[in-house]
Regions:
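Acyl-donor binding region in acyl/amide transferases
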Residues: 33, 42-172
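Low-complexity, highly charged intrinsically disordered N-terminal segments
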Residues: 1-44
């Protein structure tokens, strides 16, 4: 298999991602770069990657760095993978999520992001969609490229599944 990494316009990327994944591709303030990964022999899209400005506060990251970083400096040198999504069945059959994560850590992507933002990125971070509730993550086994530094914490409620939503809506 051969792959190409193509930077996409927001609207096209968002439409394709929304048809593939179970969430809406909402925008965050700050930097954003959107890529699709295609298998070149079949011209099939096998994954989506969206980079953006890192989260302002992340306890595992702050613990790893020893303190809350100076955000002006940190935001110039760090980038976050917000959506790292393989299409199916490529994701399951060929460990597509690991390929997408490895692409995020590649020198080619780093060069493109450095050029786009006129900086030198030295940290890539991401969070796992399901945390540890499934007993594993697609990022497991990615060392030395990605290292687990702890679970993030949130006070947001999980999104309700499609099955229970109508029942709860009627109840309320």
């Amino acid at each position: 298999m051969n792959f190409s990494i193509i930077q996409m316009q927001s609207k096209t990327f968002d439409t394709l991602l929304e048809m593939t994944a179970s969430f809406s591709p909402d925008e965050n303030p700050g930097k954003t770069a959107k890529y699709i990964v295609k298998e070149t022999n079949t011209n099939t899209v096998v994954g989506f990657i969206r980079f953006g400005s890192p989260l302002i506060n992340s306890k595992p990251r702050n613990d790893y760095l020893g303190d809350v970083p100076d955000l002006d400096i940190f935001n110039k040198r760090a980038i976050m993978g917000f959506n790292i999504v393989p299409t199916q069945p490529f994701g399951f059959n060929y460990l597509g999520g690991k390929l997408m994560a490895a692409i995020c850590c590649s020198s080619d992507i780093r060069r493109q992001l450095n050029k786009k933002y006129d900086t030198e990125f030295c940290l890539f971070e991401t969070t796992s969609l399901y945390g540890n509730i499934k007993g594993g993550s697609m990022y497991d086994g990615m060392r030395p490229y990605l290292r687990y530094k702890g679970d993030t914490q949130s006070k947001f409620l999980l999104t309700l599944g499609e099955e229970i939503y109508p029942e709860l809506k009627a109840w309320f």
